[in-house]
Amino acid sequence: MSDFDEFERQLNENKQERDKENRHRKRSHSRSRSRDRKRRSRSRDRRNRDQRSASRDRRRRSKPLTRGAKEEHGGLIRSPRHEKKKKVRKYWDVPPPGFEHITPMQYKAMQAAGQIPATALLPTMTPDGLAVTPTPVPVVGSQMTRQARRLYVGNIPFGITEEAMMDFFNAQMRLGGLTQAPGNPVLAVQINQDKNFAFLEFRSVDETTQAMAFDGIIFQGQSLKIRRPHDYQPLPGMSENPSVYVPGVVSTVVPDSAHKLFIGGLPNYLNDDQVKELLTSFGPLKAFNLVKDSATGLSKGYAFCEYVDINVTDQAIAGLNGMQLGDKKLLVQRASVGAKNATLVSLPSTINQTPVTLQVPGLMSSQVQMGGHPTEVLCLMNMVLPEELLDDEEYEEIVEDVRDECSKYGLVKSIEIPRPVDGVEVPGCGKIFVEFTSVFDCQKAMQGLTGRKFANRVVVTKYCDPDSYHRRDFW
């Protein structure tokens, strides 16, 4: 055998040997993988048995399943409690924290009107994948509702402090049962002493609205005027008027209704108290407003009112309409459109036959006595300003003009016009006092001078006590 044949035989043997080893390794690896699969299968079987056993133990220990259970892997398991919390609606049908006094529909209406940013309360995702809803701005200090939580208060007592004003309104709110939560409803007070008004800020919109019922309340002798601020914008779905009536408080705003009365033909020199005394002879008033000139502050000769007892409305119309006051005749009727045509058939016929005897200061007619008890001293008001009395020459001219005019009605005995003094509060400064020799002459002067104009100002008159006049007690 040649060397080449020997070499080729050797190669074939080596190849056969390698093929045998490869087949052996494949069979061994296949058996190993099969054993591994069997071991893993047995392990899974054991785990499944353990899980099923543990699940059965948990079901035996747990309470009976309620609604909310679900089927999984052929068995029943309880829904985790934290999943139930995720289902609670917080911001769509329930008012968020800070908006407890607003119904869900009102809250949605405010969102639609742009008064609450719709995106401000949208859930955001944390890096862990959890949904977190931002906390909404609470009502207290919220700029969203600040306009609706403020009230203008006019005609405040001179020199009143912010603390006293806050204490007064907080006390009145509690006494009237108008607070909605413990604590003080008034958060802040701002007073403008120069212009004699203040602004109140409340903690909630509803308490602000209810505080409107105190319009006309007396505070330290002053009838407060309560209004909404000029920048007030009504909130959607919320009432603008209070739902309560505070006994004894006569509001200065008379809302439109079938019971609102118009009183025309009033003498211009009558003030609020005089007209109210005329009207309250039929019953207590719920609201009253004497319309005045914004420039002079004097009456325009007509007013509006509403009675607490609506049943006396027609009686007041029957008793006051056509009444003669001085040189004027009253026109009293319902202010609402169409309501003034309401018939009075159901009223007793004796109403029109009964004269109304009233005691109204400043009036004089067959039914109304003027100025209380007449005296020989007449007080003239709204004629001069204190600064107009500083100049001696101008002062003497005023005295002379008053004397000349009053002498037309009778013999003038004396005239007193208190003048201002620097650093001293002078009693009666700005008023003019005229003493006649008889009460009769003084009455004639009052009739002739009341309602006249002096320096383009309407003259207002009243009687003065002679003893006080002689003591120079001009308060």
From Swiss-Prot:
Region (Required for interaction with PRPF19): 2-93
Residues annotated as domain RRM: 149-231, 259-337, 385-466
Gene3D superfamilies (alphabetical): 3.30.70.330
Basic residues bias locations: 23-46, 79-89
InterPro entries tied to this protein: Nucleotide-bd_a/b_plait_sf, RBD_domain_sf, RRM_dom, U2AF_lg
Cross-link (Glycyl lysine isopeptide (Lys-Gly) (interchain with G-Cter in SUMO2)): K15, K70
A cellular component annotation (GO) from this entry: U2AF complex
Residue pairs linked by disulfide bridges in the UniProt entry: none
Annotated region (Disordered), positions in chain: 1-90
Main location: nucleus
Cellular compartments annotated: Nucleus
Transmembrane segments annotated in the record for this chain: none
Positions of post-translational N-acetylserine modification: S2
Positions carrying 5-hydroxylysine: K15, K276
Gene Ontology annotations of biological process type: mRNA splicing, via spliceosome; negative regulation of mRNA splicing, via spliceosome; negative regulation of protein ubiquitination; positive regulation of RNA splicing; RNA splicing
Keyword 4Fe-4S in annotation: no
PTM (free text): Lysyl-hydroxylation at Lys-15 and Lys-276 affects the mRNA splicing activity of the protein, leading to regulate some, but not all, alternative splicing events.
Keywords: Acetylation, Hydroxylation, Isopeptide bond, mRNA processing, mRNA splicing, Nucleus, Phosphoprotein, Repeat, Repressor, RNA-binding, Ubl conjugation
Entry-annotated residues carrying Phosphoserine: S2, S79, S294
Region (Necessary and sufficient to stimulate pre-mRNAs 3'-end cleavage in a CFIm complex-dependent manner): 17-47
Subunit structure as annotated in this protein's UniProt entry: Interacts with U2AF1L4. Heterodimer with U2AF1. Binds unphosphorylated SF1. Interacts with SCAF11 and SNW1. Interacts with ZRSR2/U2AF1-RS2. Interacts with RBM17. Interacts with PRPF19; the interaction is direct. Interacts with POLR2A (via the C-terminal domain); Interacts with PRPF19; the interaction is direct. Interacts with POLR2A (via the C-terminal domain); recruits PRPF19 and the Prp19 complex to the pre-mRNA. Interacts with KHDC4 (Isoform 2). Interacts with ZRSR2. Interacts with the SF3B complex composed of SF3B1, SF3B2, SF3B3, SF3B4, SF3B5, SF3B6 and PHF5A.
Protein task: Plays a role in pre-mRNA splicing and 3'-end processing. By recruiting PRPF19 and the PRP19C/Prp19 complex/NTC/Nineteen complex to the RNA polymerase II C-terminal domain (CTD), and thereby pre-mRNA, may couple transcription to splicing. Required for the export of mRNA out of the nucleus, even if the mRNA is encoded by an intron-less gene. Positively regulates pre-mRNA 3'-end processing by recruiting the CFIm complex to cleavage and polyadenylation signals.
Protein name as it appears in the record: Splicing factor U2AF 65 kDa subunit
The organism of origin for this protein: Mus musculus
Classification of source organism: Eukaryota, Metazoa, Chordata, Craniata, Vertebrata
